[in-house]
Amino acid sequence: MVTIVDTLSNTPLRPRHPEKANRPDSISPAKPSWIRVKAPTTRGYADTRNIVRENGLVTVCEEAGCPNIGECWDKKHATFMIMGDTCTRACAFCNVKTGLPAALDAGEPEHVAEATFKLGLAHVVVTSVDRDDLADGGAAHIAATIRAIRATCPTTTIEVLTPDFLRKDGALEQVVAAKPDVFNHNLETVPSRYLSVRPGARYFHSIRLLQRVKEIDPTIFTKSGIMVGLGEQRHEVLQVMDDLRSAEVDFLTIGQYLQPTKKHHAVMAYVTPEEFSNYETVAYTKGFLMVSASPLTRSSHHAGEDFAKLKAARDALAR
């Protein structure tokens, strides 16, 4: 379980989630056997961690407490989280720090590009915190990062996982103009759970955001994901699939929600591997080019391999 308070040399710092500090604990059921993963101990993991530290970068792998960090970092795969480590939203599921972020680091795009080169990444995933404090939500910074990676690693394919740019006119267009290979924006949960899980966002705004990407540039792959185990019903998950297909989204990910701390939203259910397999089958019948659904599926897990499959699926349709 990840601590709610950041520490440095045993000295307590500010609460990681001050808005949650006084909430009563939410108790989740014990994790089933299919959820458990091994602690990261490999040389590849250590090498990736060193490259991240040397370039002064933040990864969502660490900040969000991803269960797949050992596997991904062993393969020198990492998802870079730009625009700082502090988010202006306070979603009930997320372990990223909340509060007032620091100013943007103008050198960050080049640092990310350099780390991408050092890791030898064929496919890189770049995500970010929400930056509601910025006029464009950080869109120009995301676009600059895409361009920096292109300049340094011209053969590397680029996937961005973006905020919703709520009430940020023109922001989405800046990111799309930089031409990422994959534009990912997660819905996170079904509409009925938004007020308790993702109160700062709007479900249909997120659907429209994904739809707009395809309208601006149909060649960009679009991707979205949800977590299950937050109290949703099966029919609601199927409706999300239909909504995403109506926006021409290509790739769907579905994973199990895991509670970061007892101050976060409780796990309401652990969805079985068989249920995930069924969701995957149904999603393919609805027309998604690529579907990843399993207890440990996360947005950037196996992103490189999945991009190759996604491209092959579209090429097959074109023939």
UniProtKB/Swiss-Prot annotation:
Output the CDD domains linked to this UniProt entry. Radical_SAM
Task: List keywords of the entry alphabetically.
Answer: 4Fe-4S, Cytoplasm, Iron, Iron-sulfur, Metal-binding, S-adenosyl-L-methionine, Transferase
What cofactor(s) does the depicted protein rely on? Answer: [4Fe-4S] cluster
| Ranges of residues in domain Radical SAM core | 73-289
Catalytic reactions on record: [[Fe-S] cluster scaffold protein carrying a second [4Fe-4S](2+) cluster] + N(6)-octanoyl-L-lysyl-[protein] + 2 oxidized [2Fe-2S]-[ferredoxin] + 2 S-adenosyl-L-methionine + 4 H(+) = [[Fe-S] cluster scaffold protein] + N(6)-[(R)-dihydrolipoyl]-L-lysyl-[protein] + 4 Fe(3+) + 2 hydrogen sulfide + 2 5'-deoxyadenosine + 2 L-methionine + 2 reduced [2Fe-2S]-[ferredoxin]
Pathway membership = Protein modification; protein lipoylation via endogenous pathway; protein N(6)-(lipoyl)lysine from octanoyl-[acyl-carrier-protein]: step 2/2
Q: What name goes with this protein?
A: Lipoyl synthase
Question: Gene for this protein?
Answer: lipA
